[in-house]
């Protein structure tokens, strides 16, 4: 029989690894964005994106830009591919985080 606590921790570790992959992909996207579209880079606060003084409103612009697939009309193919990858990773990470929360609640109820 599988230990439910061990299963929860395995799921949690997979979720954290996917969060790190998402973070890394977001950093790579900002590097590509700085080179191919400096105006959009400034619009989403690319320089201050991962700093403590970053502007959440501008950061949400990038999230909306990717979520609404506005990147499909962009002229740079690499940027489009990275946005697609980032969007898929965001969906996967969100689903895994939701699953971890559900598993934690179930674990608390059963133990």
Curated annotation (Swiss-Prot):
Membrane disposition: Multi-pass membrane protein
Bilayer-crossing regions: 1-21, 90-110
Keyword Transmembrane helix: yes
InterPro entries: Universal_stress_protein_B (IPR019598)
Subcellular location: Cell inner membrane
Domain of life (superkingdom): Bacteria
NCBIfam families: PRK04960.1
Name of the protein: Universal stress protein B
Source species: Edwardsiella ictaluri (strain 93-146)
